[in-house]
């Protein structure tokens, strides 16, 4: 007779040590392990809360878990990966340290399919001009923002995977779907890709993409013209509502109240709500608690600044789309020096291409250096390790000299790790060079500090906020 309790606890401990906190809480912690009562051979059921987790575990972790089971029980063990809704009612209680409680980061809220849209409100005098513009593109979606044109890397792979799941099953998979991250990291592209996919699959779907400031303007107009009934009929009748940069709702009480009603109406009707923000939901200034709590009902994912390989891929794909012949060495040069976000990356590419066309010279590595020399000179002058150390020390209220010291107390070690991580992010220096600038430390110490901050950013919104704030300060 198999005893799964001890095995699953060992499994949880292994993955908790191997994965980041976000990965562990998202993929492993929600799983439940049960004995299989209807199999002639020794068998275990590994139960996933939804299809998204099931597929991800199958692709990335199932072979490891199976191998650990065979090592633990010292014999072949059949491991069945199943969806929670497929488990018989007589199944035995779940085992594991989470006591069967699934992680709140992923929740499959609804099972019913999206219903057909209601009729849109009739035109009024005050909305006639706006309606005429909307008739050309009522969704307000950019048709070039698709999943095919979205470059995927470690920084956004979870967000993209969730977006595809939502696009394929709107109102069923994760509702709401909340994406947060800094400026220019692809949040708008990703949510509009969902909208374009939904419209392609169902042209009759009533989809609306809107920036939060435009939504605020709609609320103001409805208030001025006493047209809240029509406002509500329109927004409550959507099949898919995509709200961009919801942080601008902060402090706007009437807007938040109307959005609260719209949010509830759409969720109750099994219609999809998708939101982007520049910060984690609980960190949004001036946002009502009742909205913040609802943002956590579905899936919340972060997008991070792209890593080097992803930046190169973005440049090459952009060049291909624009019929630009771009050598990989030129793409690598641009990507190595432009690290902040996708918009600045594409801006640098446009600058290099324009310089090539104006001068009539081929787009070579030397030309790229010449075209970007002013930009790179400003970056090199402003963002040095010394500047990073001083900025981080001032931020955490410690002495700059403590960056080089041997002190290991948390009040000094954490800022030092933060400065090392930012140095790796913002400078082209190697790990040994960064270590040398921090009191002659070994490159492995720098790498450990970088990974530690990355792990904390995934699990602690305060650390992530500090990191992004410092990047913003240093970049000016």
From Swiss-Prot:
Composition-biased stretches (Basic and acidic residues): 120-138
Chief subcellular location: cytoplasm
Keyword DNA-binding: yes
InterPro entries named in the record: AAA+_ATPase, Chromosome_initiator_DnaA, Chromosome_initiator_DnaA-like, Chromosome_initiator_DnaA_CS, DnaA_C, DnaA_dom, DnaA_N_dom, DnaA_N_sf
Gene Ontology molecular function: ATP binding; ATP hydrolysis activity; DNA replication origin binding; lipid binding
Region feature Domain IV, binds dsDNA, mapped onto this chain: 357-476
UniProt keyword annotations, A-Z: ATP-binding, Cytoplasm, DNA replication, DNA-binding, Lipid-binding, Nucleotide-binding
Keyword Cytoplasm (UniProt): yes
Region (Domain II): 75-139
Region (Disordered): 110-141
Subcellular location: Cytoplasm
Positions of the UniProt region annotated as Domain III, AAA+ region: 140-356
Domain I, interacts with DnaA modulators: annotated segments: 1-75
GO terms, biological process: DNA replication initiation; regulation of DNA replication
Gene3D superfamilies xref list: 1.10.1750.10, 1.10.8.60, 3.30.300.180, P-loop containing nucleotide triphosphate hydrolases
PROSITE patterns xref list: DNAA
Known function: Plays an essential role in the initiation and regulation of chromosomal replication. ATP-DnaA binds to the origin of replication (oriC) to initiate formation of the DNA replication initiation complex once per cell cycle. Binds the DnaA box (a 9 base pair repeat at the origin) and separates the double-stranded (ds)DNA. Forms a right-handed helical filament on oriC DNA; dsDNA binds to the exterior of the filament while single-stranded (ss)DNA is stabiized in the filament's interior.
Assembly mode: Oligomerizes as a right-handed, spiral filament on DNA at oriC.
Domain notes: Domain I is involved in oligomerization and binding regulators, domain II is flexibile and of varying length in different bacteria, domain III forms the AAA+ region, while domain IV binds dsDNA.
Similarity field: Belongs to the DnaA family.
Protein's name according to its UniProt entry: Chromosomal replication initiator protein DnaA
Organism: Nitrosospira multiformis (strain ATCC 25196 / NCIMB 11849 / C 71)
Classification lineage: Bacteria, Pseudomonadati, Pseudomonadota, Betaproteobacteria, Nitrosomonadales
Gene symbol of the encoding locus: dnaA
């Amino acid at each position: 007779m198999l005893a799964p309790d001890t095995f699953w606890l060992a499994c949880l401990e292994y993955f908790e040590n191997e994965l980041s906190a976000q990965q562990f809480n998202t993929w492993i912690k929600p799983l439940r392990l049960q004995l299989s009562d209807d199999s002639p051979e020794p068998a275990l059921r590994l139960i996933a809360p939804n299809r998204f987790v099931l597929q991800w575990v199958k692709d990335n972790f199932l072979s490891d878990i199976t191998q650990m089971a065979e090592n633990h029980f010292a014999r072949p063990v059949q491991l069945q990966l199943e969806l929670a809704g497929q488990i018989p009612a007589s199944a035995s209680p779940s085992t594991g340290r989470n006591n069967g409680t699934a992680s709140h980061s992923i929740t499959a809220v609804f099972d019913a399919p999206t219903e057909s849209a209601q009729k849109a409100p009739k035109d009024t005098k005050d909305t006639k001009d706006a309606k005429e513009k909307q008739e050309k593109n009522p969704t307000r979606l950019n048709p070039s923002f698709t999943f095919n044109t979205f470059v995927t890397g470690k920084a956004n792979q979870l967000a993209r995977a969730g977006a595809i799941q939502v696009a394929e099953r709107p109102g069923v998979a994760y509702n709401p779907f909340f994406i947060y991250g800094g400026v220019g990291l692809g949040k708008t592209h990703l949510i509009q890709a969902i909208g374009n996919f939904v419209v392609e699959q169902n042209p009759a779907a009533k989809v609306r993409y809107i920036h939060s400031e435009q939504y605020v303007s709609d609320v103001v107009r409805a208030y001025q013209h006493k047209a809240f009934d029509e406002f509500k009929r329109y927004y409550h009748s959507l099949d898919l509502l995509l709200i961009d940069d919801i942080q601008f709702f902060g402090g706007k009480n009437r807007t938040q109240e109307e959005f609260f009603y719209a949010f509830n109406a759409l969720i109750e009707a099994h219609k999809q709500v998708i939101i982007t923000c520049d910060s984690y939901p609980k960190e949004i200034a001036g946002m009502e608690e009742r909205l913040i709590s609802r943002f956590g009902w579905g899936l919340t994912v972060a997008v991070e600044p792209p890593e080097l390989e992803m930046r190169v891929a973005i440049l090459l794909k952009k060049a291909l789309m624009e019929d630009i012949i771009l050598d990989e060495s030129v793409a690598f040069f641009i990507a190595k020096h432009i690290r902040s976000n996708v918009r600045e990356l594409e801006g640098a590419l446009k600058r290099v291409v324009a310089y090539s066309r104006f001068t009539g010279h081929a787009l070579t590595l030397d030309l790229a250096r010449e075209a970007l020399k002013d930009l790179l000179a400003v970056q090199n002058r402003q963002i040095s390790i010394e500047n990073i150390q001083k900025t981080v020390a001032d931020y955490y209220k410690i002495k700059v000299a403590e960056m080089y010291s041997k002190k290991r107390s948390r009040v000094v070690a954490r800022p030092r790790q933060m400065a090392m991580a930012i140095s790796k992010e913002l400078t082209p220096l190697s790990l040994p060079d960064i270590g040398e600038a921090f009191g002659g430390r070994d490159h492995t110490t720098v790498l450990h500090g970088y990974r530690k901050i990355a792990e904390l950013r995934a699990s602690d919104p305060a650390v992530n906020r500090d990191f992004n704030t410092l990047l913003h300060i240093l970049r000016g």
